[in-house]
Structures are given as C-alpha cells and as structure tokens.
Amino acid sequence: MSLMSDDSEVFVQAPTVANAELNIEAKPEANAQVNAEADSDANLGNNLGEQQTTDESAFGRNIGKFTAFVKEITGSGTEVEEQEKRNNHTISVDPSSNHENTSFEPTTYKILGRTYTSTTDASARVQELLWLSYRCGFEPIPKSDDGPQPITFFPSIVFNRLTLVNLSNLRSLLDKDHFTSDAGWGCMIRTSQNLLANALLRLFHTTGGQPQNFAVTKTEADVIELFQDTLSAPFSLHNFIKAANSLSLNIKPGQWFGPSAASLSIKKLVNDYNLIQQERRSERDSGRDSGHKVPTPNLKLHSKSADSDSDSDSDAISKRNSIPYVYVSENCDLYDDEINAIFELEQRPILFLFPIRLGIEQVNKYYYSSILQILASKFSVGIAGGKPSSSFYFIGYEGEDDLIYFDPHLPQIVQTPVNLESYHTSEYSKLKIDQLDPSMMIGILIETIDEYQEFKMSCFESDNKILHFHPLVTTAPRESSINQSWEEVQGEEEFVNLNIVKNEEDFVDLGSASTQGQNHEPS
C-alpha cells in the first residue's frame, strides 16, 4: 500500500486483485496539474479559488472511478451499463435557473403525491427528500464464518482530508474480517431506509395534515441520526441485518435482502423502537407523578419541549413523537375492521408495506396504471426495488411512463460530524415503466382512519388492481411465513424476490438439507 499526499487530498492505493484493469493509476496530465497547482500555491496563493475548484474536480473524478469500479464488481458491468444508457436519464436541474421548455406542452411531474409542471419546482422537491446511499468506512460489522467475505481492495480513492480523522478510518476500509462498506450488497437495505426515512420526515413535518417547509431543521437532523451506520442507531444497516437474523431469515452480512426480508426487518425495528419510546414515556410520566424529574429521550422529533406542563401539549407531543406502526401485507389484502382496530389501539399512524411481485420477468402491463396511481397518491412514500440486479427508490414519475428514482449505488465516505448535505441530491434518474422489475416493496403512510377511508376510495375510483380491500377479516390474516433465508443469486444479480419460486431457484429453502452450510459470496 502506498500513500501520496498533497496540500488538500490523500490518495490511497489499496491492495488489488490480479486484474490490472482495477489498478487505476494517476494520469500524467493529472500529475502535471497537481505540480502546477503546487507552484501556484508557492506564489503567495493568488489563485486559491481556482485551486479549490481543481481539488473538487479531482475528488469528483476519483469518486467517479470508484463508483464505476463498484458497478463492475456488483454486476452492473458494461452490458448492464449500456442498457441503462439507453433506458435511463439522469437529470440535474439548477433550482436558480428559470429555463423552461416552451417548445412543447409543460411536462407533468408527480412526486410522492404532489404535482408539478415546472422542472425547477420538481427539482426543488426532489432535493427536499432524504437520499441514503452506499457508505464506506462505517462501524465494522463482523463477517460470518459461513457468509461472504468483505471486499478487501479498492482502486485509487481520493479522501478529503476532513474525512480522515485518524488512521483507524483508513485501516477499517482494508479490514478482511469486518464489513465497513455495503457497496455491492446493501442497495435493498438503503432503498428501504430511504422509504422509511422519508415517511418519518413527512410525519414530523406535518401539522393537521398540512406539510410545513422542508428546510434543513433539527427535526431532519434527528431523523437522519436514526439511520447512521452504527449499532446504536435504531434503523442502521447494522440493525437491519440484526433484525433479519433474529427473524430466522438468517441473512448474513454481505448477503442481499429481498422486498419481504426488508419489509419484515422494518416492521421489527420500528415496532421495537416504539416499545422503547413507550417505556421511556411511562418512566417520565411516573417521575412526574412522584415529583421526580426523569430525563427525556435524547431524540426529540418536534419543536416543542417534551417537558411541557400543559397536558394538552403533552398529548400532542406524544402523538408527534410516535414512530408509525408498521403493517406488512404480502398479498396486498387490507381488512377494514382490522385496520380500524389498529388505529384505536395504537393511536398513531400506520406505515403499510406491500412486498410483492407483479409479474414473472417483467411487470405485467395490467398493473401499470395502478403503480402510477400509487406513486401519485398523497399517501405514498415511494417504492423500493424494481430493477433487475439492483434496487432503486422510486419517488414518482414524469409524463406518462417515465418513473423517477433515487439511485443508492453511489458510495460516500462516512463523515464525522454528519454531513447533512450528503443526504440530499438534486439529481434523479428515470426508467421506463416497461423496464421495471416485478419485485418491489410499496410504502403507504396513513395517519388516521379517515385518511384510510380516503385512500381506499381513491383506489376504488382509479380501479387499483394491486391493493385489495375487504370489510371484515373472514380468515385471520397470517403473519409473513418466509422459510427462505437468503437468495441464491444468479450470475451477479444483487436483488431478487423472496416470494416467488422460479425454475432458476432464486432462493434457498432453509428446510432443504442439501443447502445447509452453503456459502454465498459476491462474485
């Protein structure tokens, strides 16, 4: 391993495999540019602004190389990339620009229940949403003895010096016994985090059903804190893996999640977190009754103090402080009496998750209009999944058939303190609906029984063919019964569905003796 440093960056050449193409060396012209910049610094630093711009460009180029490298090792190689070039479009709009396309009729954008005819307004809305992507250098996750091995090599990566607080961060990236990055295997977890994070952000930014401004606030910082890549953060990558393991899904670090595993993990993590919050509130209330002051939870997802003396304020705060109840339906059946009972008992919003497969190799055209109706609903919090070999977070659509999504496959370095700007992007990609993979997890956030009835009526009016509503539970709905632990991924696919048995055997049955102890590693 060799280190080369200049005034602004540290270049790390990590160990490489015997593939010369992965060993990306600095170009001669880049070295000449660095030397020229060093000479410029010696001349009283007259061109500091230009120097900073060049540094940022160098950082961008190297991150671009790293991203391309990750795509190569995760199955998104040249063949897939060429297909994406034909089908996908990446949009980056400067919100300060007033340029609109006046040659044609205005394009309509539907983004999580809001409608826009201005590209600038649509881009601004996209930038308000939270975006979670691959991270590198996070708290180590021990590998499993019979699971995949951590990636122990990287091409030349540029680290901004601010992200390298000490050498332990660098060493962690080269750890052979622990995962310190989810690049190549964590995209379904990241898109699930995207869905949950934006559901929470919407919930805590609303008052009486009316959205407030989505400026970067302490509320947003608190929501992001819940998803940090540490075991102490309730909705971290670490705890998704831990939850899946405790549910007998037996997913090991480095193995891929499907929509069902993701939805069940969210359900467990959120409901466990709610139990902890309820216990804390009970302790606080008991302390008040006895005259003793009990510390309030560190997490405050509201603007008022949790120590308000007003009973009405306390009740309102308690409601706003509640993470939603999670309801998972793999067959997309909803029973009115059961939903009503949950609202009465829980007294908090419900996050509905539907891990489904809408076809075999492709989404059946029968469901196209229903997918668009769900994304356009004001109760939608997006769709996770939906692309062969990858998982994306779909947040809406443009025109009639271009789905809009966030891509989690851009690796970012973990920063301390947390860089809030790294959880936002003005860029999104587009995918034709006929290119959508049938495996996905749909998210719907409903705050009251009246909203449930409103959503139900909107589905009836649009003849939604995905969701099925019933007045009574005639047969008690079963909890998810998945007897598959993880998927046997064909080729280098990263994302397949857990629910449908295919001839290619997309998953392994835990009950099958022939598969016990089988290792599964990214190729």
Curated annotation (Swiss-Prot):
GO cellular component assignments? nucleus; phagophore assembly site
Instruction: List GO BP terms, alphabetically.
Output: aggrephagy; autophagosome assembly; mitophagy; piecemeal microautophagy of the nucleus; protein processing; protein transport
A single GO molecular-function term is:
protein-phosphatidylethanolamide deconjugating activity
Q: What is its EC number?
A: 3.4.22.-
- From the UniProt record, list the reaction(s) this protein catalyses: [protein]-C-terminal L-amino acid-glycyl-phosphatidylethanolamide + H2O = [protein]-C-terminal L-amino acid-glycine + a 1,2-diacyl-sn-glycero-3-phosphoethanolamine
Keyword GTP-binding in the entry? The reply is no
Give the Basic and acidic residues compositional bias ranges: 279-292
Q: Composition bias, kind Polar residues: at what positions?
A: 89-104
Q: Does the keyword Cytoplasm apply?
A: yes
Localization (cell): Cytoplasm; Nucleus; Preautophagosomal structure
Entry annotation: catalytic residues? C187, D407, H409
What keywords tag this UniProt record?
Answer: Autophagy, Cytoplasm, Hydrolase, Nucleus, Protease, Protein transport, Thiol protease, Transport
Q: Where is this region: Disordered?
A: 77-104, 279-316
The record describes the protein's role as: Cysteine protease that plays a key role in cytoplasm to vacuole transport (Cvt) and autophagy by mediating both proteolytic activation and delipidation of ATG8. Required for selective autophagic degradation of the nucleus (nucleophagy) as well as for mitophagy which contributes to regulate mitochondrial quantity and quality by eliminating the mitochondria to a basal level to fulfill cellular energy requirements and preventing excess ROS production. The protease activity is required for proteolytic activation of ATG8: cleaves the C-terminal amino acid of ATG8 to reveal a C-terminal glycine.
Identify its protein family: Belongs to the peptidase C54 family.
Per its record, how is this protein called by name?
Probable cysteine protease ATG4
Gene that encodes the chain: ATG4
